[in-house]
Amino acid sequence: MSWFPIAIALVLGLAFGSFMTVAIYRVPAGESLVRPRSRCPSCGAPIRTADNIPVISWLMLRGRCRACGARIPPVYPLTELASGGLFVAVALAYEDPWRAVLLAPFAGLMVAISVIDVRHRRIPNRLIYPAFLIAAAVIIVGDLAGGGLDALDAGIGLVAYGLGLMIIALISPKGMGMGDVKLAGLIGMVLGSIGLDLVAVAAGMGILLGGAGAIVALLAGQGRKSAIPFGPFLAGGAVIAIFVGHPIADAYLNLLT
């Protein structure tokens, strides 16, 4: 792949990450994603267009507001960098344009959902529901256009992963919330459109990461009653499946044969 599409993917990823930073702060607060324009979280001063360039502006301002000098949280540039990196990685990993268009913003969304779940212990419907609609539209159109997406497998993945976590949530409501169930359904739908083996890998890795996180929390003295957000582990499993899901599934099947 030439450098030009990679550069385009990076720019789009940074821009998407910048939008996700707005969502991270505004969605949990019930604020509009469009108005008012971006502002300093400390003094509320509107951020100039020149100071709103992803990553670069934060570095130029040394992580501080131009108006009041207050520290701007590093979650802004880190989210933008993560999104930009994921967009580039997806562009390099997937030659099929329909798959890339579906997976790149999905991976960036996983970053935002993880941050929100860690901070607020919930996964907002304002992000999940639009993601369902947009992803479903891309999958259906991509399937009809002969792209590398399968709408039927997407539906199977949605039901399988979503229903699986719903059963767990009903059995152990304190350990799993309905936000996690909806996120699992979204992951199952998106990854299922690529291959059902990716859904299996995402589920397995999500469980492994969640178990490791629970062990770390116990060792850190948080105790069994402390709420541990499961969304980041589901999101992490999904991202792992995007990039190495097929090799992991193949390796597992080889062990069984």
Ranges and model annotations:
Residues 1-97, 254-255:
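N-terminal transmembrane signal-anchor/hairpin module of polytopic inner-membrane proteins
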Residues 6-11, 77-81, 89, 100-104, ...:
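Hydrophobic alpha-helical transmembrane segments
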Residues 16-21, 83, 87, 138, ...:
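Alpha-helical transmembrane segments of multipass membrane proteins
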Residues 27, 90-94, 141, 145, ...:
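Helix-loop junctions at the membrane-solvent interface of multi-pass transporters
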